[in-house]
Amino acid sequence: MVALFCNQKLEEYHVLLHRHRPVLLAFCVLNLGFAVLATVENVLVIHALRSSSTLPGNLKKMFLSLAFSDFAVGFLGQSMLGIITAIMLKMTANGNYDLDFLCPTLITVCYSVIYFLTCVSFFSIIAIAVDRLLVIFLHLRYHELVTSKRVIFTFASLWMACGVATFIFTQLPNHQIIFVAVIEICGLLVATTAYIYIYSVIRSLTTVHPQREHQLHNHEQNRNRERKSASSAFLVYIVFLACFLPNFCCIMLLTSNRSTVSFILANHISGFLVLLNSSLNPVIYCWRYQEIRRIVKNSLKKLLFIR
């Protein structure tokens, strides 16, 4: 099964190398460039999150899970993909299209790492959306029900579940498209439903009748914190949607015909957007949270020897 999975991927690359070589070259450069960017950004964000004293504990753990998976996507996934693509481009430039040495190990390992880490990133964002929903829905009971141990257990289970899903994915090469489509649509629906509810509640809070304002005065600081956290998570979700929704659409196209060159190309483009998500998430953290932004700036100054 693993050999079949690898051969299918290799066939796709053979098609793109013959028909869309400049696009593959662009992918190679972009993947290697954003691999470095994602690695550096997420290292800085992980340090900032660990040093933060104002970010809610549960949210910090969730952001750490997301940042670590995004770091690994850049450091391992994108860099491996960029290097393998560069090898294929160099060999075929000399007229050598014998790329069988890449299977069954190299391509399988590369895509297994990518699928595993993007799966963790995908579900971490969904978990953040659900957590922001619980903050508003449970309010005062949130810390009683959503404890630190439960968050750690949930995310440990998430990482293990993504490992199992990756194994299943590589073992079902003929059904992998449907498998990924089901996972993506379920995740997109859960995250979208959560944020629709979150912002319907926030809108009602911002339009409270004047005579009721004094009743909420004592909770205003907590409410503002909740709104800021929800807004930050919502920006993560918007980027997430822009990066993952095109991939779902391309998967739907491939279900109709896996041999159409334009569909294969579109799927690789949407795959790059999925990887790009790991470079965009850290920017959102730094932009929305003043303390994290300050810690990142100080870290950069130290690295660049700027006083």
Q: Residue ranges of each PLM-predicted region?
A:
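Intrinsically disordered regulatory tails of 7TM GPCRs
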Residues: 1-15, 54, 203-225, 290-307
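Extracellular TM2-ECL1-early TM3 structural module of rhodopsin-like
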Residues: 20-32, 59-127
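Hydrophobic alpha-helical segments of membrane proteins
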Residues: 43, 75, 79, 229-253, ...
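Extracellular N-terminal segment of 7TM GPCRs
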Residues: 1-44, 85, 90, 306
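Class A GPCR helix-loop hinge within the 7TM core
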Residues: 116-154
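Intracellular effector-coupling site of seven-transmembrane GPCRs
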Residues: 69, 200-247
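Extracellular-loop-to-transmembrane junctions of the mid-late helices
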Residues: 161-200
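Seventh transmembrane helix
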Residues: 190-191, 242, 249-252, 268-307
